[in-house]
């Protein structure tokens, strides 16, 4: 995207299995993908794109740490309400067809670590540092220090009660 955001998919509602109901909208920028995306761009020599992605990430993470989302729209949109489009049949009849993603409102502790890892990788890879990155990281670390023991929805994006996930604590 011209904003520097990297979208996970160009499609919505492709089923995890034909006829199933796990048909999500992935047309968003996921913070969990940030480190791997930045690393791939740097390895491939796309330093300008890597810098644009890092800058996009800094804009997304610049708010209050407790409001950090797991995903954003390509231009940093925060409101991603999930709607079902019941009049559409879906791929191979797999319903529902969705737009938006309710997981955007989930608390997933590991994304804080993913953001930290991405910003560390950006510096280690030689991207021009951004002075405000340290302020953002300090705020994220303070939040993590106070909240690391909270249950969350985890990498699995569980729809239901929050739980304790090892992955969330380690990342």
Give the location of each predicted region.
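Acidic, mature catalytic/reactive cores of soluble proteins
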Residues: 1-171
């Amino acid at each position: 995207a011209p904003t520097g955001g990297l979208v996970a998919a160009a499609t919505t509602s492709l089923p995890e299995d034909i006829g199933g109901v796990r048909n999500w909208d992935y047309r968003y920028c996921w913070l969990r993908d940030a480190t791997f995306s930045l690393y791939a761009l740097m390895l491939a020599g796309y330093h300008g794109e890597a810098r644009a992605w890092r800058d996009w990430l800094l804009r997304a993470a610049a708010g209050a740490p407790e409001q950090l989302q797991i995903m954003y729209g390509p231009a940093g949109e925060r409101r991603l309400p999930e709607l079902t489009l019941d009049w559409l049949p879906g791929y191979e009849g797999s319903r529902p067809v969705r737009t938006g993603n309710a997981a955007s409102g989930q608390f997933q502790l590991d994304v804080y670590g993913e953001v930290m890892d991405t910003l560390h990788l950006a510096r280690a890879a030689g991207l021009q540092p951004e002075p405000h990155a340290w302020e953002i990281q300090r705020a994220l670390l303070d939040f993590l220090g106070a909240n690391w023991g909270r249950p969350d929805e985890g990498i699995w994006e569980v729809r239901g009660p929050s739980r304790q996930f090892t992955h969330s604590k380690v990342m």
